[in-house]
Amino acid sequence: MANLNADGKLKQICDALRLDTLKPAEDEAAALLHNAKEQAKRIIQEAQEEARKILETAEERAHQKIKQGEVALSQAGKRALEALKQAVENKIFRESLVEWLEHVTTDPEVSTKLIQALVQALEAQGVSGNLTAYIGKHVSPRAVNELLGKAVTTKLRKKSVVVGSFVGGVQLKVEEKNWVLDLSSSALLEIFTRYLQKDFREMIFQGS
């Protein structure tokens, strides 16, 4: 019986020691575990947030690069289109116009009509003096003189037209004033280009 009482007291002492020492340690360990879990949770959340920010920044930079690339491609496309338009204008419009003008303005009848128009314009403005009429280098002076007749050739300095250095068309010079009225093929080309090129571009490249 005495041993039983002794065993009971020993158990009581052990239980008391457990409550006094082990229980606080267990509680402390539980608290540490809880804190560790909370800290790990915060670290994971912070890492996820940082990863999200890094991803957003990377996506934004990628979009900027794509946008810059699109702008560069657009500008390059516009430059290429403009270069193509210029090439088409030079090939179709200007070259065709040059060919047509040279064909038309080397006709003696056209040269005659241009000289007559210029002489009449000067007379209408009351301008008089020695006149020299130049024609294109591929035009026959004899043919133009015959078409002009003496009514006009007598007003010319040499009583005849003079062959110029240009292809077609005419130039009329007022010697005393050193005026040159230029309707040569090259001058007519510039006039036609200035007034017709815009219409040509709109007609050919409408909607482009």
UniProtKB/Swiss-Prot annotation:
One of its GO terms (cellular component) is proton-transporting two-sector ATPase complex, catalytic domain. Keywords: ATP synthesis, Hydrogen ion transport, Ion transport, Transport. It comes from the Bacteria. One of its GO terms (biological process) is proton motive force-driven plasma membrane ATP synthesis. Signal peptide: none annotated. GO terms for molecular function: ATP binding; proton-transporting ATP synthase activity, rotational mechanism; proton-transporting ATPase activity, rotational mechanism. InterPro entries: ATPase_V1_Esu. Produces ATP from ADP in the presence of a proton gradient across the membrane. Belongs to the V-ATPase E subunit family. This is V-type ATP synthase subunit E. It comes from Chlamydia pneumoniae (Chlamydophila pneumoniae).
